[in-house]
UniProtKB/Swiss-Prot annotation:
Swiss-Prot/TrEMBL keywords: Cytoplasm, Lipopolysaccharide biosynthesis, Nucleotidyltransferase, Transferase
GO MF term (any one): 3-deoxy-manno-octulosonate cytidylyltransferase activity
Function: Activates KDO (a required 8-carbon sugar) for incorporation into bacterial lipopolysaccharide in Gram-negative bacteria.
SUPFAM superfamilies: Nucleotide-diphospho-sugar transferases
Gene name of the record: kdsB
Name of the protein described by the UniProt record: 3-deoxy-manno-octulosonate cytidylyltransferase
Recorded family membership: Belongs to the KdsB family.
Length: 250
């Protein structure tokens, strides 16, 4: 049974920290194929890989994926997804889930959760968060933090430690990290990418701040399952390979 949403996976080859990571293998299967397989398990109406790289496109076609070739000038995965929507036959209200191409163990239930959340909110975007479990994570600028209203809408996203525990600098209770999984309405996504980057976005290097800056809301739900590590570095790949061996007893 398919659900009423589409998954688009932006797949960029030239990552700044780990170029070519999507074509690295975990037990003989590339990272991008593992992401694609996990997305299929969420039972969406379609799964599309959006890329500007010939080798990624060729490999994706070989394992049976629908591929859309996009411009090489895009600065973000969201821009790449918007091109797919503009080229396709999506309805304005279609739910589009942005699944990052470097998450080989993305949980299908999280994809379903973020898509379902969008259908139950007036916000044009939904995303997820997870409780922070250590001071090290809280103070890591590569981990994006989010603070929310009492009705689960984002107040702010930051690479800094928010909220700041004034009276106990070693505390991390009631802090949440953002999970980079988004659902949007197709029409809103096209509108979003037409806006110029805002000041806060440029300072933090977080494009979702453009949405808040422009006066729109983002629904944020706590993930129903703990998210697993994405792959940003060679060290992350080694950890992912070991996780696979440990989990599946290969």
């Amino acid at each position: 049974m398919s659900h009423n949403f589409h998954v688009i996976i932006p797949a960029r080859y030239h990552s700044s920290r780990f170029p070519g990571k999507l074509l690295q293998e975990i037990n003989g299967i590339t990272v991008i194929e593992r992401v694609y397989r996990q997305a299929l398990l969420a039972e969406p109406k379609s799964v599309i890989i959006a890329t500007d790289h010939d080798e990624i496109a060729d490999r994706a076609i070989q394992f049976g994926a629908e591929v859309v070739i996009t411009s090489h000038t895009h600065q973000t995965g969201t821009d790449r997804i918007a091109e797919v929507i503009a080229k396709g036959s999506f309805a304005p209200d279609d739910v589009i889930v942005n699944v990052q191409g470097d998450e080989p163990f993305i949980r299908p239930k999280l994809i379903q959760q973020v898509a379902c959340s969008l259908t139950k909110t007036k916000a044009p975007v939904s995303t997820l968060c997870w409780p922070i479990s250590s001071l090290e994570i809280l103070n890591n600028p590569n981990v994006v933090k989010v603070v929310c209203t009492r009705d689960n809408h984002a107040l702010y996203f930051s690479r800094s430690a928010i909220p700041f525990h004034r009276d106990d600098k070693n505390a991390y209770s009631n802090t949440f990290r953002h999970i980079g999984l988004y659902a949007y309405r197709a029409a809103f996504l096209l509108e979003f990418v037409s806006w110029p980057p805002c000041t806060l976005e440029q300072i933090e290097c977080l494009e979702q701040l453009r949405i808040l800056w422009s006066g729109f809301s983002i629904r944020v739900d706590e993930a129903c399952e703990e998210p697993l590590q994405d792959i940003n570095t060679k060290e992350d790949l080694i950890l992912a390979q070991q996780y696979f061996l440990d989990t599946f007893n290969v």
